[in-house]
Amino acid sequence: MTRNIDPIELAKALIAVPSVTPATGAVFDVLEAALTPLGFTVERFIDGIEPDGPVENLLAVRRGSGPKHFGFAGHLDVVPPGVGWTSDAFAPEIRGELLYGRGAVDMKGAIAAFVAAAAATPVDAGTISLIITGDEEGPAIFGTRALMEHMDARRVTPDMIVVGEPTSVNRLGDMVKIGRRGSVNIWIDVPGTQGHVAYPHLADNPIPKLVKILAAIDAVVLDEGSDWFQPSNIEFTDIEVGNGATNVIPASARARLSIRFNDQHRGAELVAMIERIAHEVEPAARVLGKISGEAFLTPPGELSELVAEAIHAETDICAEMSTTGGTSDARFLHALCPVVEFGLTNATMHKLDEAVAIEDLHRLTAIYRGILMRVFL
């Protein structure tokens, strides 16, 4: 037995509910109302506390008689719309061939497409899970990671997962993500002794020390890339001394840097490397690292092949398998099973007048259904 769900109408219903990260409440009501008639058992959880919570997460499972278990992961939270939209960001509007609204691309549209695809898939074909968080765009502390704990407690473990991130670049289907680089942010704090610039012998200026540290870091070449990854890179993102006076040597100097790294490195090793460099210049320097995620790769195989086949069948495009771009919740989910990311074109995500082509939503629905049928049959 199958049902028909219009992905356009469901996308509009989801977009119409403001859900700036972290998202809770009404937007999950809309999704639950769509899933329950399809035979899904829906559980919702409130995880975390301020300042990074509370976050709402949703796990929906429809068990079938087939042996395979397919998971779809996504997020209902969106980034703030900002000012300057042609129309209300949370009043979905179709103009021409495009559906406008915050989340149309990233990623309420993809969630709507997958629900429509699941509705068109026979209930007994196999087990389908939806793993949906309200915190992917924010700190992601109480989002998918917390949801995975609920999955573990319920012994919900898909054989494979597709994350509905907007991976396509120029045309729907031109790119699938099979991995992502890792990400670590590092803060360096060099202490000094405040004093008058006319009496430098009575002070200890931390700025020259910080400059030496940053120069040494800038000279580091982490690698030349690997089979599936581009070279790792270190980027300085902030330098600050908090000194508004022209005649005062500051008491401290701070810098922040971000490293995007491939599968040749681990986040903790990179933090330790930066700490060694800093301490060679100033033993009292303080270094703090925050790892957002490790690099991961799902080597080309069954999952990427069936996704590519479904894309080609609908679009006649041979999708590129890639690891470019920023981080996503796939960095957590890959610990469960093979994971790839595939969704809409990303040209307008996080931008004013975010929009998705109506045709692309229908095509994505067909591709997702093609993936499900290839998994289950």
UniProtKB/Swiss-Prot annotation:
CDD domains xref list: M20_DapE_proteobac
UniProt: Zn(2+) 1 binding residues: 75, 106, 165
Pfam families given in the database record: M20_dimer, Peptidase_M20
Record's keyword terms, sorted: Amino-acid biosynthesis, Cobalt, Diaminopimelate biosynthesis, Hydrolase, Lysine biosynthesis, Metal-binding, Zinc
Superkingdom per UniProt: Bacteria
Principal EC category: hydrolase
An example Gene Ontology biological process: lysine biosynthetic process via diaminopimelate
Cofactor, how bound (note): Binds 2 Zn(2+) or Co(2+) ions per subunit.
Pathway terms, separated by semicolons: Amino-acid biosynthesis; L-lysine biosynthesis via DAP pathway; LL-2,6-diaminopimelate from (S)-tetrahydrodipicolinate (succinylase route): step 3/3
Binding site for Zn(2+) 2: 106, 137, 350
Catalysed reactions, as listed in the record: N-succinyl-(2S,6S)-2,6-diaminopimelate + H2O = (2S,6S)-2,6-diaminopimelate + succinate
Active site (catalytic residues): 77, 136 (proton acceptor)
Molecular function GO labels: acetylornithine deacetylase activity; cobalt ion binding; succinyl-diaminopimelate desuccinylase activity; zinc ion binding
Record field: transmembrane: none
EC number assigned by the record: 3.5.1.18
Cofactor(s) the protein requires to work: Zn(2+); Co(2+)
InterPro entries: ArgE/DapE_CS (IPR001261), Bact_exopeptidase_dim_dom (IPR036264), DapE_proteobac (IPR005941), Peptidase_M20 (IPR002933), Peptidase_M20_dimer (IPR011650), Peptidase_M20A (IPR050072)
Quaternary structure and interacting proteins, as annotated: Homodimer.
Similarity remark: Belongs to the peptidase M20A family. DapE subfamily.
Function: Catalyzes the hydrolysis of N-succinyl-L,L-diaminopimelic acid (SDAP), forming succinate and LL-2,6-diaminopimelate (DAP), an intermediate involved in the bacterial biosynthesis of lysine and meso-diaminopimelic acid, an essential component of bacterial cell walls.
Name assigned to this protein: Succinyl-diaminopimelate desuccinylase
